[in-house]
């Protein structure tokens, strides 16, 4: 094999795997998880299966070749493909080493994910890669811990997990010592603190007042969803919404549609938010990444404006083939176009270079998703070809608010606050994860 110099945070999980069945590789985006994973399993004689989104195949192939490894020992399957195979062969992982990229995708225990989780119990060695082990709920991590342990160590049902470890009324964690013991030595944790090889970044919160078309559509959804199309008394301030008191199903549906209109009204082709984003795009510097959870009311709307301004761009979404995705990323990294528009489905496993601006068009339910998106542009060596004074990424988070006369909280503002509160709680939970990691126990001096 070629003499790749592994970093200390990569050597520890590789060493850990010599005497253990598996580990969750919870390392920052851009920390070299792919390389760590392939070295961790290549030291054994088992054939190696890699499972991941189609966008991660090239990164694995490139790293395997860079390391001078025998690529014939590796077989790559997308999540979709492995689910099809498991329908006829549940023992495919027996006597195999398995790497699962973006392993948080297994958090939802639907039928196909249960197939994968159950089948992975037969693997001889297992490495689960994720920069975001908790996406929506704390029990997301339980599925991964159980796979690594090869047994049901933690409850995966959300209600039971919360009953054991989370007090919803006070938003505090409980039974921390029990949780610590369940997590002990199942996770390798590493957070990037390198200030030399990574670009600096600065975040900017940009609030934009909605126009009258957005306000009218907002009223429509309030009446249709929250009041079920019943007549609303004239003296009721329909914009005064206590989101926390709404039934969860109704609240989630309402927030989903209002997040979309916060970008642009259905009957419009632009909005104050779109126009303000365009000002930053036109001014540069390039290249620029734009993220939206929505296609029609986000990515596509902005693409039309870019066309009108004759600004070069490409789109990465769930509809883009692997070959085309690789070509787009390569062209972006070589400065062949100015703006990259990415959707939620297209945001995983991208390795972007020299990005100067990242725009988050609307808030997300969970801060971890946004952190993951930003991490695609802030990576080890991502700006190394630029002069030192140009190695900076400006991050713009866009929030639509009501005009002053309404004095109410918009859906964007509510989601931003909710995401921040969940992040504060997650930080406490995350500290338990860190304390239980192999770095603080198995390798503790």
From Swiss-Prot:
Positions bound to ATP: 27-34
Swiss-Prot/TrEMBL keywords: ATP-binding, Helicase, Hydrolase, Nucleotide-binding, Virion
Keyword ATP-binding: yes
InterPro entries assigned: Helicase_ATP-bd, Helicase_C-like, P-loop_NTPase, SNF2/RAD54-like_C, SNF2_N
Annotated compartments: Virion
Class of the enzyme per the UniProt entry, highest EC level: hydrolase
Residue span of motif DEAH box: 101-104
Family: Belongs to the DEAD box helicase family. DEAH subfamily.
Protein name: Putative ATP-dependent RNA helicase L538
